[in-house]
Amino acid sequence: MSEITIRPVLTKADRKAFVDLPFRLYAHNPNWVPPLKDEVHGLITPGKNPWFEHGEAEFFLAERGGQIVGRISAHIDHLALKQPPEQGMGPGCGNWGMFEAEDAAVAAALIARAEDALRAKGMTRSMGPISLAMWDEPGLLVEGFDHPPVVMMGFNSSAYAPWVEAAGYAGVQDLLTYDLPIDKGLPEL
């Protein structure tokens, strides 16, 4: 198997590859709901996303054999650094997110690169996956892969949780969504 190279997103072509990767990875998954590409471009562009007024981010691509096989962000929300640690973030806590990987080796390399980037910025803890803003798409889908995601909830491969756990991460909080068929009226309370 070819060597995995992790490189920063620097050019317009890199940004396009970063945005386009999930479209290839989930092309045959009927439950994946693709985002609007222009919206994702806006999220990762400092002049278009107000999050960058209080945050900073680096974006990385994983490449193997000339093909993009993964992506990740390493980011710091300076407002979150001011929060008490018992609220989940706090001083020294950086984040990684926008995570996609073809396999476990790519996942491990990407997470390690994001952690290195956060350490280089003085962070002493890492939490992820979290999109740039904590309230966009936090965490991993760990069950319900047979349903499309609801608004503001991410979608990922069922392989991701074991890969993230292999990197030393553990779940912090469960976020739940519920589905109720209402075609026959609402149930009695």
Regions from the language model: what does each represent?
Residues L43, L141-G144, P187-E188:
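Short low-complexity, flexible loop/linker segments enriched in glycine and/or proline
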Residues P22, E53-A57, R71:
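Membrane-embedded alpha-helical bundles of multi-pass transporters/translocases
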Residues L61, Q67-D77:
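Conserved beta-strand in the GNAT
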Residues S2-G47, G92, L175:
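Short amphipathic alpha-helix that is part of the acyltransferase structural core
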Residues E3-I4, G154-L189:
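Acyltransferase donor/substrate-recognition loop-hinge adjacent to the catalytic core
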Residues H78, L132-D136, K184:
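Feature marks short, surface-exposed loop/turn motifs that line or immediately flank catalytic pockets
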Residues T45-L61:
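A short helix-loop-beta-strand connector motif used in the catalytic cores of GNAT acetyltransferases and
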Residues Q83-Y169:
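Acyl-donor binding region in acyl/amide transferases
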